[in-house]
Amino acid sequence: MTANNPQNRYDYDVVVIGAGHAGTEAAAAAARLGAKTALLTTNLDTVGQMSCNPAIGGVAKGQIVREVDALGGLMGEAIDATGIQFRMLNRRKGPAMHSPRAQADKKAYQNFIKYRIETQDNLDLRQETVEDLITEPIADGQDRLANQRVIGVRVRGDAVYHAPTVILTTGTFLQAIMHTGKSQSAGGRAGEGTTAGLSGALKGMGFTLDRFKTGTPPRLNARTIDYSGLEEQPGDDDPQPFSYLNDAISSPQMACHIAHTNERVHDLIRANLDRAPMYSGQIDSRGPRYCPSIEDKVVRFADKSSHQLFLEPEGRQTCEVYVNGISTSLPRDVQDAMFRCIPGLEKAAIMRYGYAVEYDYCPPTQLWPHLESKSVSGLFFAGQINGTTGYEEAAGQGLIAGLNAARTAASKTPWVPSRQDAYIGVLVDDLVTSGTDEPYRMFTSRAEYRLLLRQDNADRRLTAQADELGLIDAARRERFHRKLAEIERGTELLQQAKFQPETGPTVRGDVYLRRPEVTWNVIAEQVPELAGIGREAAEQCSIDIKYAGYIDRQQAEVHKQSRHAEKSIPVSFDYDKIGPLRNEAKEKLTKVRPLNLGQAKRISGITPADLALVLAHLENNSLSQTKSSASVDKRASSDNESSRPTSSASDSL
């Protein structure tokens, strides 16, 4: 939509639409960079709300939260302040697999995020309903691909927010429909409506939209659960914080509990599949593979006689319990009957029924790696609108979109972490390069260099870059440098210490620490000076030393792979000019517009032969340009020489 002259106009550098986990991180990041930012949401009471499970982190997700924190984001501090149970997953595996996870006090988490947004400099939080995007055409030649630019948004009530950059973080609210049995209603979350106008606006701009589905389980009243026969799942004895600003977690922890479904439950579900929207044909959108509904579990894993259910308290001052593992859109009467068949839950009262949500998303191959639209300059996308699932994935995207919107508004070049620098880099690259045909969830297996992308070293990977970008404050900077100094001091002390093993010659402390049975604490008992090294610095020293060989090999592999991978490809590169290139390759490369050979390599269907042709063409172009430049220089030199007087002429003068 083009601009007119509304009665009320507000001017900003960045406007963010939606105040969930992506929107709050986006707005906060833009504001930290000094951009005048507006965060618009239809309901101020749902800022930072946990729509589904009351937890942060998990396998690979916990690493993303640590990265968001290392870049100055909100999520790590929020869960440290409001968590009610902390666990480090995969402790029995190597450090690359360690993943922090915490249960949250749902309302306390939401209030923490909202207050941080309200008190952030350069940021205005407004309750508004956005009805349209305002754009203007771009003159030919001003942008190599985009044919229009965003200049603001129109909200309900004859008002306009003008800005050179806009970020869409609309979650599951685009054209959203909720399903419980045959019952349907418009809305992206129970008790709330949908955002219909923006889907139409995006389609009108030429964007392709598709549909995904997600779901949520029932919530039970804790007072009606018989915990006596359920397995208790406590938190860690030594809970570790998510944020690098915190040394420890001191708040008391609450236990979760484990229940199990059985054949009675499964038979009930099978008997009612014709009433399940996913199986009756009422829903034809694809849902998250790794968070299936209980209906899906019973059908897909028919040989299993039982499925685990995790009973997760939603806070310290509520009786609501989230039943992780039984997401469903079956009718209410079936949900009631299911719980009556589960030991410990026979008398459980449902406080909120489960439901499924269908919603529009924008396939992310329409974006550049910095999450700006290829066709509409200044328009950014982050979170579930890009086809992802999960609070953590949304937060990571939000931060990247926010900082790049602010940089774009200030006419600065974009910044995106690479795949070898961060899980966030893996996430963004996967989305914009390959897209996704199902809700995308991060796993450690998606990262080629996961030994380098550990949860313990996110600050060492990213905080220095965050400082250069202007994302962090002085307190975080000083704390980071103190930690680096501690790591250096700890390494020096280990190298200076001498140990006499039971067999063999005397060895240095760092050499002794490489032994599998030797821990930091064993050495610290004999080197009192190590007592001054903090827990995180000690952990870093230990991992650096124990896994030095593996880390060195992975870093060498990164260097090897990046030799050609970093070869840049012009945005307007014409693949049709490469005669021998397969038509499939031409189509896919033109669609994605990879910025370098590394990104081109990761496009599905692109072969090594295709890459070789592209590389050869790039090098030939470069060589031709070099020769052309040299020829011009030579002609210019010749012209200059001919314009100078010869020696004989000089003599005659």
Swiss-Prot record:
Residues 624-653 are annotated as: Disordered. One of its GO terms (cellular component) is cytosol. It is found in: Cytoplasm. Homodimer. Heterotetramer of two MnmE and two MnmG subunits. It comes from Rhodopirellula baltica (strain DSM 10527 / NCIMB 13988 / SH1). Belongs to the MnmG family. This is tRNA uridine 5-carboxymethylaminomethyl modification enzyme MnmG. GO terms for molecular function: flavin adenine dinucleotide binding. The gene is mnmG. Its cofactor is FAD. Residues 643-653 have a biased composition (Polar residues). SUPFAM superfamilies: FAD/NAD(P)-binding domain. It comes from the Bacteria. InterPro entries: FAD/NAD-bd_sf, GIDA_C_N, MnmG, MnmG-rel, MnmG-rel_CS, MnmG_C, MnmG_C_subdom, MnmG_C_subdom_sf.
